[in-house]
Amino acid sequence: IRHGEWTGMDRFGFSGSLIASKLPRALELVSSMVQEPRLPEEEIENIRSVLLQDLVALNDNPARRASVELNRRYYPAPFNRSSLGDAAGLKATDRSRMLALHRELFGPQRAILSVAGKVKADEVFRLVERLFGGWQGAPAQLPPFGRISPHEYAHLEVDSAQAQIVLASPSVKFGEEGYYAGKVAVSLLGSSMFGRLFMELREKRGLCYSVYARHGANTSYGTVSAYVGTTPERAQESLDLLVGELERLKGSVTQAELARSKTNMQASLVMGEESPGSRAASNATDWWLLGRVRSLKEVNDAISAVSLDDVDSFLSRHPFTPCTILTLGRAPLEVSSSVTKHRSQPA
């Protein structure tokens, strides 16, 4: 069984890829982990050491470090915390605290099990009833999401041969009107090598080694984020051009650009659904957010229906600027007050 475990902003996750005939044994292991974790004392120190090393290694991954620092400033507490944790918290955690956290947060009320592959539904249902039918636990109570922080610019000074630029701006929530128009708009900017950011910053001018934009959303928030990895000498021009492309998008998209962007999104959707693992993950996410699973046709049709007017309407209601910007590198950059609304401050 190839497996993985993860923590996110508002949930824990377990995943696995395996031969279909091994599903009963795999679900037995998952059942044991979520209902009766052993958490052997002798292994906790080894895991703590690895996690502390991951924190130190963040200094060797400037792109991720910039993202962590941006999220800490952009999202409301406690949702702005990194899944890496912090050194003080990791050192203070012991087995009793972890077991108490398990009792508090792990329950069947919002648990979702998604299985995709060469399996029969009735057999999966019988396994789930046998292995999880007696699961007890109170529903976890998450705090209200709160408000996104006021837009600001912050710089983290690091003596490096690289410069990192990251930004975030509020957008439409998952499932709200304009959600698919928002996805298409961001795809036009930077989800592939055909996006405007890649073409303008990297292909035409050679300003950076990496650039992209993404749209992320759940039922509590929506966020447009962008990243540029460049050199200190080209950082200011890269930032200026990045902001310029964000502000230029409304009213400038051609029908050909729109068609290409939607085709790329639909191709990625189809290719992703060919993997049982991706299908299981998307089904679980849909159920978590919507309480139902969207069909491939539903998503495909929603993307197809997005028009140029829809994109411009989205951009009118959710402009990419003002935004929150963080840079990481040798020196701070010049950022217009109209872009961030608040003066720069040290990170």
Task: Enumerate the language-model features and the residues they cover.
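His/Glu-based metal-binding/catalytic segments typifying zinc-dependent metallopeptidases
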Residues: 139-196, 302, 347
